[in-house]
Amino acid sequence: MIDDGNVLLAFGLTLFAGLATGVGSAIAFFARRTDTRFLAVALGFSAGVMIYVSFVEIFRKAYEVLATQTTEVLASWYTVAAFFSGALLIAVIDKLVPGYENPHEMHTVEEMDMGRAALPQDTKHDFVRLKRAGVLAAVAIGIHNFPEGLAAFSAALSDPALGVAIAVAIAIHNIPEGMAVSVPIYYATGDRRKAFLYSFLSGVSEPIGALVGYVVLRPFFTPMVFGLLFASVAGIMVYISLDQLLPSAEEYGEHHLCILGVFSGMGVMALSLLLFL
């Protein structure tokens, strides 16, 4: 079921996806304005890739694996249950992270400067409060990226070509997420470099999630467990797409740009799957 030769590749892809938060941080550090039209298309593209591959490839593959271990009826029930369990997991995590500390609440480069300018510079209490908020933001994105790392890792472990596509989609998703984390960190410190560093390092939780998941689950990595994990990965990615990527794409740009990105992502994913038939 699992080719150990794929482990390093899977881990490398997950590391690439996680550290893409640093790209978002760099944008917040160097850019003078946010290209919202590009972000709208990019986020829509990422959502299109995730939704298409989840329903067309991952969900089907999870069912096929489970069907080899039990009856077709039970395999269908297990696949559906694991799919919604994955969605529920990421929904609970999202619910537990409040308002501004949530890295899925999108912000822009311009907002960093406006927000900092509005802060009272000589209030020690506000400085402490904002520093605490910045730390919370770093912790929040770490929590969010943990299951995403496991998703990218498990996909690459099963099928390297599929893993590459998912890692790229998650990396695109992590770019504006890194920008969002940089905002409260910058509020707390007034230091763009520190905002970049904190946000960049918070992405490390993605490969850590992959590593922990692999170490913990490896002794139990039977076909049944793998099938359940794969179905839950599909649920996680569909939830991220519908709850976070698509609304953010709409917020950043025009509706038609978002839809263009979605179908472009689906088309690229469909073509890549056809080429590997």
Swiss-Prot record:
Function description: Mediates zinc uptake. May also transport other divalent cations.
Database matches in InterPro entries: ZIP (IPR003689), Zn_transptr_ZupT (IPR023498)
Q: Where found in the cell?
A: Cell inner membrane
Is the keyword Iron in the record? Answer: yes
Q: Which Pfam families match?
A: Zip
Topology in membrane: Multi-pass membrane protein
Q: Which GO terms describe its molecular function?
A: metal ion binding; zinc ion transmembrane transporter activity
| NCBIfam families, alphabetized | PRK04201.1
| Record: residues binding Zn(2+) | E148, H173, E177
Question: Which positions does UniProt annotate for Fe(2+) binding?
Answer: N145, E148, N174, E177, E206
Q: Which residues cross the membrane?
A: 7-27, 38-58, 73-93, 133-155, 165-187, 196-216, 220-240, 257-277
Q: Which reaction does it catalyse?
A: Zn(2+)(in) = Zn(2+)(out)
- Family that this chain belongs to: Belongs to the ZIP transporter (TC 2.A.5) family. ZupT subfamily.
Its Gene Ontology cellular component terms are:
plasma membrane
Q: What is this protein called?
A: Zinc transporter ZupT
Which UniProt keywords are present, listed alphabetically? Cell inner membrane, Cell membrane, Ion transport, Iron, Membrane, Metal-binding, Plasmid, Transmembrane, Transmembrane helix, Transport, Zinc, Zinc transport
Taxonomically, which superkingdom?
A: Bacteria
Source organism: Nitratidesulfovibrio vulgaris (strain ATCC 29579 / DSM 644 / CCUG 34227 / NCIMB 8303 / VKM B-1760 / Hildenborough) (Desulfovibrio vulgaris)
